[in-house]
């Protein structure tokens, strides 16, 4: 049986490869994505695909997990919540920029496309 952490690693690998198809294969048809770089809630596969098509077109796109921040919470036998912090990197106008973001997922490992909910937001500056 797959572990929830493996879903996250598959997702990160797909981001690093810029593979929209591999990303979409992880999102259930009912999935909701609250993305890092959008002010919209995406609850249709078409809008999730459009978001990742735009994001994956970025030069030097990568993502790195801050391993010590990852927490996995079992909600039932097959359903898990995960949260933590990762760092997006990509180039804008030739300059490589980094964006720290907090994330949460709800995954159902009994489904072929296990991601049901994914929220990611840039970490704001402290007041």
PLM regions and their residue ranges:
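Short, solvent-exposed loop/turn segments at secondary-structure boundaries
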Residues: 37, 93-96
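A generic structural micro-feature
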Residues: 61-64, 76-80, 95-99
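A solvent-exposed, acidic/Ser-Thr-rich amphipathic alpha-helical stretch
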Residues: 2, 20-74
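Short, aromatic-enriched amphipathic alpha-helices that serve as compact interaction elements
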Residues: 1-18, 26
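A short hydrophobic beta-strand element
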Residues: 78-88
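Short beta-strand edge/turn micro-motifs at domain boundaries
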Residues: 98-127
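A short, structured loop/turn motif at beta-sheet edges
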Residues: 72-80, 107-114
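Hydrophobic/aromatic beta-strand elements that line small-molecule binding cavities or substrate pockets
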Residues: 52, 67-72, 86-88, 101-108
């Amino acid at each position: 049986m797959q572990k929830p952490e493996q879903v996250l690693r598959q997702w990160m690998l797909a981001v690093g490869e810029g593979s929209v198809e591999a990303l979409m294969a992880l999102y259930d048809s009912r999935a909701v994505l609250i993305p890092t770089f959008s002010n919209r809630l995406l609850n249709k596969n078409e809008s999730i695909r459009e978001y990742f098509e735009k994001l994956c077109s970025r030069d030097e796109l990568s993502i790195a997990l801050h391993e010590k921040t990852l927490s996995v919470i079992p909600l039932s036998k097959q359903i898990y919540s995960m949260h933590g912090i990762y760092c997006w990197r990509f180039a804008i106008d030739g300059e490589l920029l980094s964006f720290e973001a907090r994330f949460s997922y709800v995954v159902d490992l009994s489904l072929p496309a296990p991601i049901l909910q994914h929220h990611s937001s840039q970490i704001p500056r402290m007041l």
